[in-house]
Amino acid sequence: MKKTPIIFALLLFVFCFSAIATSYAAENRPRFFHEGDGRLKLASEKNNYTFDGAYRLGDGYDETALKAIHRVFDAPFDPAFPKVSLRLIAFLDFLEDRLHPGARLTITSGYRSPEYNTRVRARGGLAAKASLHQYGMAADFVMDGVASAKVWHFVQALDFGGAGYYHGRTVHVDVGPARSWDEKTSGVSTGISDDNKLIGMITDFDVYRPGDTVTMRFIRMTAFPIGVAPVFFLEGRNTDRHAGKALLFEPVFAVPIEGRCPLFDNIDQMAMIRWQLPARLPPGRYAVRARFCGEIMEKMPPEVATPTFEVARP
């Protein structure tokens, strides 16, 4: 798989993202199941950058604010290919609003490139091979006025996201699958994620409308190349008559694909996968399922599905 990006596709993503974000924010409709009031106070312990203000405004997500937040996370900023997940930003906001409104979060570890994550592991650091820091979906932090143990227990009770606590001053929080661990149960050095055993897929938001563009990405990969069947499935997750019905579709990938089993070589190639929801899609709960193809490793699942998302009424 060549690394040449589809520039037009990325420009189209920026346009669609801006239009959708503006439409929802103007009507004050939530985009995530766990989000706060749209304001955060952040500081980086690593590079001393700070952010204090609103990142979600009446006319959408503020690009200047998101750029500043990326700096705090030590992540490069590209509006066409954001490195820090909006879902993570919204979840940190959610935690701050409920545990200590207005508190500052000091980020001790934010975004990590795959190369940097590998270096951390090589020098014996507690970095998972499939770390969600590589996807901008995780943060280690300290919340002013709140014990990290309290944050850990609070996230555990939500049954959403990951929470790790090593009985020190910081806590790890991510927006991956619901799970929790400490220094005795982290499994970092056990090979738990080898051979793509934990591979998954997510959507960019939790709430959409018919006709919106859904942007998907695969996460927690540990071995490449990976073959992905170019036909995905939209499946109902309701209890009504739409439950279980699948709609086949071909999404647009971030890189050119060829054949019935295109191969992908890195994390970035398996991000920015887009598809426009049908304009007449009935409101309800859905998930997208994708199948792998070619040589599938023994521990790797043959297919994965996104967490359930909601399609609201127009």
Predicted regions and their residues:
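Bacterial N-terminal signal peptides
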Residues: A9-S18
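Catalytic cores and adjacent binding grooves of peptidoglycan-active enzymes
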Residues: Y24, G38, A43, L126-A138, ...
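Active-site acidic/histidine clusters and adjacent loop/turn architecture
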Residues: K46-T108
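Acidic helix-start/capping segments at beta-turn-to-alpha-helix junctions
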Residues: R104-T118
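Charged, often glycine-rich, active-site loop that binds/positions anionic groups
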Residues: E115-S131
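Short, hydrophobic beta-strand segments
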Residues: P262-P282
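Internal, hydrophobic beta-strand segments that form the core of beta-sheet-rich folds
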Residues: P282-M297
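Short beta-strand elements
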Residues: E295-P314
